[in-house]
Amino acid sequence: MIETLLQSPSSWTNFFIFFGLAVLLLFAVLGFVTYGILAERKVMGFMQGRIGPNQVGGRFGLLQTVADVLKLLLKEDSIPKAADKPLFILAPVIAFAPAFMVLAVIPFTDKFQFADIGVGLLYYIAVSGITTIGVVTGGWASNNKYSLLGGMRAAAQMISYEIPLVMSVIGIVLLAGSLNLNEIVAAQEKVWYIFVQPIGFVVFLIAAVAELNRTPFDLPEAESELVSGYHTEYSGFRWAFFMLSEYVYFFGMASLITVLFLGGWNPVMFLGFIPGAVWFALKFSSVVFLLIWFRVTFPRIRGDQLMEFGWKVLLPIALANIFLTALIKELFF
């Protein structure tokens, strides 16, 4: 359907169809993220020997996150007097919009994808970097030293870990011969790239956690050092924009890992009778669980350790993986 609409002449009908699909995707993602946050809180509670949310919406706390969202929407919208008002208002939108834009190219099954473009992987990496501009803008516009430090940390962290993140997937591009995410999944029909590219997977996973600003790389919003980091002065629905963008990226990155390294919707061996959507959901859930496990387990590292690890460890390993992959492809494929 999407391909037909893209190839048809421009018209107001097509515009409203695309607009309706975009709004539908927005609400679907927001609903998923709402309960994804609840799932994370329950898993963290289990790992820490707690029950987690258990009051609002029954014993499982099914409406806890919904109540939290309503609370944020009803809070007073305050803007500091000394803040740069236009940029302060614009920053959450700049951080929020790209988070949804990247989901357009993720193939969840062979038939369920919003837009199948030839350079889906390049598009994801390029668009995801825009969020950092929103974070830095919010930190600077707040006219608060803690916010500014958080924004500067976010920029330094993104620059340091975007490079090994990109380098780690070059091995996959060499093997698949394409930047199209559907073709990368198709190339894993016999063997998943996590087994062919174990070094690339480890580098990508670590760099992805750093890009998401999650523990142990959550320096831009380190509560014990910077109050709340770049969104210290934000409250209500503007703060919710930053939070939602963080979690949409979290689930988007888990989807990308599933596509690049775990074969997407490809089944395991003789279990092909199980629908591809189920396989994607299982692999995606495993990656999400692993990332939550990281958050609960590891302590935050220091800023100098973060920079050294990115430039002196991950980047050389990612470069070595490219040469190793090229050599293997030349000799055996």
Swiss-Prot record:
InterPro entries linked: NADH_UbQ_OxRdtase_su1/FPO, NADH_UbQ_OxRdtase_su1_CS
Places the protein is found: Cell membrane
Keywords: Cell membrane, Membrane, NAD, Quinone, Translocase, Transmembrane, Transmembrane helix, Ubiquinone
Originating organism: Bacillus cereus (strain B4264)
Full protein name: NADH-quinone oxidoreductase subunit H
Catalytic activity field: a quinone + NADH + 5 H(+)(in) = a quinol + NAD(+) + 4 H(+)(out)
Molecular function per GO: NADH dehydrogenase activity; oxidoreductase activity, acting on NAD(P)H, quinone or similar compound as acceptor; quinone binding
Topology in membrane: Multi-pass membrane protein
Family under the similarity heading: Belongs to the complex I subunit 1 family.
Coiled coil: none
Any single Gene Ontology cellular-component annotation: plasma membrane
Described function: NDH-1 shuttles electrons from NADH, via FMN and iron-sulfur (Fe-S) centers, to quinones in the respiratory chain. The immediate electron acceptor for the enzyme in this species is believed to be ubiquinone. Couples the redox reaction to proton translocation (for every two electrons transferred, four hydrogen ions are translocated across the cytoplasmic membrane), and thus conserves the redox energy in a proton gradient. This subunit may bind ubiquinone.
Encoding gene (name): nuoH
The protein's Enzyme Commission number: 7.1.1.-
GO biological process, one term: aerobic respiration
Transmembrane segments: 15-35, 88-108, 117-137, 159-179, 191-211, 239-259, 274-296, 313-333
Location, primary (coarse class): membrane
Keyword NAD on entry: yes
Assembly, per entry: NDH-1 is composed of 14 different subunits. Subunits NuoA, H, J, K, L, M, N constitute the membrane sector of the complex.
PROSITE patterns from the UniProt entry: COMPLEX1_ND1_2
